[in-house]
Amino acid sequence: MGKPAKEFTKADICHFIRENGIRMVNFMYPAGDGRLKTLNFVINNALYLDTILTCGERVDGSSLFPFIEAGSSDLYVVPRFSTAFLDPFATIPTLTMLCSFFNKDGEPLASAPRYTLLKALQAFNEVTGMQFEAMGELEYYVIAEDEGLFPATDQKGYHESAPYAKFNEFRTECMAYIAQAGGQIKYGHSEVGNFTIDGLVYEQNEIEFLPVLYMPCTLCGTH
């Protein structure tokens, strides 16, 4: 959109959708089981798009979090424009955004995972005067049949290269998709923990992200 993601506005989102033939919008948000949930919207017209971007959409909180009772389960998921990205896997042109939870009174859901984290970060800042920087990483195993060619040494796979590391290309493809979706990647590499057992190769890989600065001003949950 020609500007840093943190500066994205509703007008930017609407303009991008209009100019790039985007036909669908996805809202995504984590539930109590730790998995991302998805709500799909077809863009009917400009007014409808403006409505969902402004007001979000109602969801059944009791189906998302075990601690919310069915009798008072109305929650709203409101998109954070700074998280917008083109879905690299969608066959229909789709713009996806992560959302924050709000209760029926328009207040941030106090028990929502992201809001809980932001409150903790604000308390940390108030007590210490320091800012908290979080740096995450993905560590995973790729499991495949052992073809017996150029075997890697067990537990010696740190920063290994092909042909001893078999799945570097898969890792770099994953990194490209993550970057396309707005992820800020520091680097990727093969990890120590590779081994072979029962005719299968287990290769450990890592994708590490750049530090992210969480500012207390984001407590409102709309940035």
Task: Describe the residue ranges of each PLM region.
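ATP/Mg2+-dependent ligation/transfer catalytic cores
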Residues: 1-190, 207-211, 215, 219-222
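Short, conserved helix/loop micro-motifs enriched in His/Cys and acidic residues
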Residues: 193-205
